[in-house]
Protein backbone atom coordinates (compact mmCIF):
# COMPACT_ATOMS: atom_id res chain seq x y z
CA UNK A 1 0.00 0.00 0.00
CA UNK A 2 1.41 3.41 -0.99
CA UNK A 3 1.12 5.88 1.87
CA UNK A 4 1.86 9.57 2.31
CA UNK A 5 2.35 10.32 6.01
CA UNK A 6 1.86 13.83 7.43
CA UNK A 7 2.80 14.56 11.03
CA UNK A 8 4.86 16.83 13.22
CA UNK A 9 4.69 16.12 16.96
CA UNK A 10 6.00 13.36 19.23
CA UNK A 11 2.59 11.65 19.27
CA UNK A 12 3.04 10.81 15.57
CA UNK A 13 6.50 9.21 15.81
CA UNK A 14 5.52 5.71 17.08
CA UNK A 15 2.78 5.57 14.45
CA UNK A 16 5.22 6.55 11.67
CA UNK A 17 7.73 3.93 12.86
CA UNK A 18 5.05 1.24 13.02
CA UNK A 19 3.84 1.98 9.49
CA UNK A 20 7.45 2.01 8.24
CA UNK A 21 8.01 -1.45 9.75
CA UNK A 22 5.29 -3.02 7.60
CA UNK A 23 6.94 -4.77 4.65
CA UNK A 24 3.89 -4.53 2.39
CA UNK A 25 3.36 -0.80 3.06
CA UNK A 26 5.43 1.85 1.29
CA UNK A 27 5.71 5.34 2.74
CA UNK A 28 6.35 7.34 -0.42
CA UNK A 29 6.70 10.67 1.40
CA UNK A 30 6.67 12.06 4.93
CA UNK A 31 5.35 15.62 5.18
CA UNK A 32 6.10 17.65 8.29
CA UNK A 33 6.16 21.28 9.32
CA UNK A 34 9.38 23.23 8.66
CA UNK A 35 12.19 23.43 11.23
CA UNK A 36 11.52 25.95 14.00
CA UNK A 37 13.73 27.76 16.50
CA UNK A 38 14.03 25.81 19.75
CA UNK A 39 15.95 26.00 22.99
CA UNK A 40 17.77 28.85 24.66
CA UNK A 41 19.81 29.61 21.55
CA UNK A 42 16.79 29.35 19.26
CA UNK A 43 18.57 26.88 16.97
CA UNK A 44 16.49 25.72 13.99
CA UNK A 45 15.31 22.22 14.87
CA UNK A 46 13.46 19.70 12.72
CA UNK A 47 10.16 18.35 14.03
CA UNK A 48 10.09 15.01 15.84
CA UNK A 49 8.52 13.41 12.75
CA UNK A 50 11.09 14.88 10.35
CA UNK A 51 13.89 13.60 12.59
CA UNK A 52 12.32 10.11 12.76
CA UNK A 53 11.81 10.07 8.98
CA UNK A 54 15.47 10.92 8.43
CA UNK A 55 16.51 8.10 10.80
CA UNK A 56 14.28 5.74 8.79
CA UNK A 57 15.72 7.02 5.48
CA UNK A 58 12.30 8.15 4.29
CA UNK A 59 11.85 10.93 1.74
CA UNK A 60 10.71 14.05 3.60
CA UNK A 61 9.13 17.37 2.65
CA UNK A 62 8.69 20.32 5.02
CA UNK A 63 6.60 22.89 3.16
CA UNK A 64 5.33 26.02 4.88
CA UNK A 65 1.88 25.00 3.64
CA UNK A 66 0.98 21.53 2.38
CA UNK A 67 -0.94 22.91 -0.60
CA UNK A 68 2.46 24.17 -1.88
CA UNK A 69 3.33 20.54 -2.73
CA UNK A 70 -0.13 19.48 -3.91
CA UNK A 71 1.06 18.49 -7.39
CA UNK A 72 3.99 16.51 -5.92
CA UNK A 73 1.56 14.61 -3.67
CA UNK A 74 -0.73 13.84 -6.60
CA UNK A 75 2.23 12.56 -8.65
CA UNK A 76 2.99 10.00 -5.92
CA UNK A 77 -0.45 8.47 -6.51
CA UNK A 78 -0.91 7.42 -2.87
CA UNK A 79 -3.55 4.90 -1.95
CA UNK A 80 -4.04 6.61 1.39
CA UNK A 81 -2.71 9.59 3.30
CA UNK A 82 -2.25 9.17 7.05
CA UNK A 83 -2.25 12.34 9.16
CA UNK A 84 -1.15 12.36 12.80
CA UNK A 85 -0.61 15.55 14.82
CA UNK A 86 0.36 17.45 11.68
CA UNK A 87 -0.48 20.94 12.88
CA UNK A 88 -2.12 22.30 9.72
CA UNK A 89 -5.66 22.13 8.45
CA UNK A 90 -5.62 20.34 5.11
CA UNK A 91 -7.41 21.89 2.15
CA UNK A 92 -9.99 19.70 0.41
CA UNK A 93 -7.85 19.36 -2.73
CA UNK A 94 -5.10 17.72 -0.60
CA UNK A 95 -7.54 15.60 1.43
CA UNK A 96 -8.90 14.07 -1.79
CA UNK A 97 -5.55 13.30 -3.49
CA UNK A 98 -5.31 9.69 -2.34
CA UNK A 99 -7.46 6.86 -3.66
CA UNK A 100 -8.97 5.96 -0.28
CA UNK A 101 -8.94 9.41 1.28
CA UNK A 102 -7.05 10.83 4.22
CA UNK A 103 -7.11 9.02 7.56
CA UNK A 104 -6.43 10.91 10.79
CA UNK A 105 -5.21 9.25 14.00
CA UNK A 106 -6.72 11.44 16.74
CA UNK A 107 -6.05 10.99 20.49
CA UNK A 108 -9.64 11.11 21.73
CA UNK A 109 -12.90 9.26 21.34
CA UNK A 110 -14.41 11.45 18.66
CA UNK A 111 -16.66 13.38 18.51
CA UNK A 112 -15.53 14.23 22.06
CA UNK A 113 -12.46 16.43 22.49
CA UNK A 114 -12.00 17.67 18.95
CA UNK A 115 -9.14 20.07 18.31
CA UNK A 116 -5.43 20.42 18.87
CA UNK A 117 -5.16 19.51 22.57
CA UNK A 118 -7.44 16.54 23.32
CA UNK A 119 -5.05 14.87 25.78
CA UNK A 120 -4.78 18.03 27.87
CA UNK A 121 -8.56 18.49 27.67
CA UNK A 122 -9.19 14.94 28.93
CA UNK A 123 -6.90 15.56 31.90
CA UNK A 124 -8.22 19.02 32.81
CA UNK A 125 -11.82 17.79 32.57
CA UNK A 126 -11.01 14.97 34.98
CA UNK A 127 -12.15 12.24 32.58
CA UNK A 128 -11.56 8.63 33.58
CA UNK A 129 -11.09 7.45 30.01
CA UNK A 130 -10.09 8.74 26.64
CA UNK A 131 -8.88 6.87 23.59
CA UNK A 132 -7.86 7.00 19.97
CA UNK A 133 -10.02 7.40 16.88
CA UNK A 134 -9.17 6.66 13.26
CA UNK A 135 -11.31 8.85 11.07
CA UNK A 136 -11.62 10.03 7.50
CA UNK A 137 -10.79 13.70 7.23
CA UNK A 138 -13.24 16.05 5.60
CA UNK A 139 -13.21 19.85 5.32
CA UNK A 140 -14.03 20.39 9.03
CA UNK A 141 -11.58 20.00 11.93
CA UNK A 142 -11.64 16.49 13.47
CA UNK A 143 -14.88 15.77 11.70
CA UNK A 144 -15.73 12.96 9.32
CA UNK A 145 -16.67 9.30 9.47
CA UNK A 146 -14.97 7.36 12.27
CA UNK A 147 -13.32 4.17 10.99
CA UNK A 148 -12.58 2.82 14.46
CA UNK A 149 -11.98 3.94 18.00
CA UNK A 150 -10.65 2.33 21.13
CA UNK A 151 -10.88 3.50 24.74
CA UNK A 152 -8.01 3.79 27.21
CA UNK A 153 -8.45 4.28 30.96
CA UNK A 154 -6.86 7.36 32.51
CA UNK A 155 -5.12 6.39 35.75
CA UNK A 156 -5.28 8.54 38.88
CA UNK A 157 -1.65 9.60 38.54
CA UNK A 158 -1.61 9.96 34.76
CA UNK A 159 -0.15 13.16 33.39
CA UNK A 160 0.26 14.31 29.81
CA UNK A 161 3.76 12.81 29.73
CA UNK A 162 2.38 9.43 30.81
CA UNK A 163 -0.79 9.45 28.73
CA UNK A 164 0.60 10.67 25.39
CA UNK A 165 2.93 7.68 24.75
CA UNK A 166 0.18 5.24 25.81
CA UNK A 167 -2.21 6.80 23.30
CA UNK A 168 0.48 6.90 20.59
CA UNK A 169 1.15 3.18 21.07
CA UNK A 170 -2.59 2.46 20.93
CA UNK A 171 -2.81 4.53 17.73
CA UNK A 172 0.08 2.54 16.23
CA UNK A 173 -1.67 -0.75 17.02
CA UNK A 174 -4.94 0.55 15.57
CA UNK A 175 -3.40 1.81 12.33
CA UNK A 176 -1.92 -1.64 11.65
CA UNK A 177 -5.13 -3.44 12.56
CA UNK A 178 -7.68 -1.10 11.00
CA UNK A 179 -6.11 0.72 8.03
CA UNK A 180 -5.76 -2.41 5.89
CA UNK A 181 -9.34 -3.42 6.77
CA UNK A 182 -10.60 0.01 5.75
CA UNK A 183 -8.70 0.02 2.44
CA UNK A 184 -9.91 -3.51 1.60
CA UNK A 185 -13.52 -2.55 2.40
CA UNK A 186 -13.94 -4.72 5.51
Regions inferred by a protein language model and the residue ranges of each:
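Short, well-ordered alpha-helical microsegments
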Residues: 12-14, 69-70, 90-92
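N-terminal Rossmann-like dinucleotide-binding module
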Residues: 1-40
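N-terminal beta-loop-helix "entrance" segment that forms/cooperates
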Residues: 34-54
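Short amphipathic alpha-helix with an adjacent loop that forms part of the alpha/beta core around
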Residues: 67-77, 96
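Short acidic-hydrophobic, aromatic-tinged amphipathic segments that line or gate anion-handling sites
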Residues: 60-65
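Donor/substrate-binding cores of folate-linked one-carbon enzymes
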Residues: 80-186
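Catalytic cores of RNA-modifying enzymes
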Residues: 1, 53-56, 73-80
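Short, structured coil segments at secondary-structure junctions
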Residues: 23, 56, 97-98
Amino acid sequence: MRIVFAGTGEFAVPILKTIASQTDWDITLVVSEPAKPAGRRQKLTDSAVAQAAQELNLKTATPAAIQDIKSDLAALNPEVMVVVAYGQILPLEVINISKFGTVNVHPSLLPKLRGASPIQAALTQGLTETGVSLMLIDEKVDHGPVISHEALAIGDGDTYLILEPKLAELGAQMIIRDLAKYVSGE
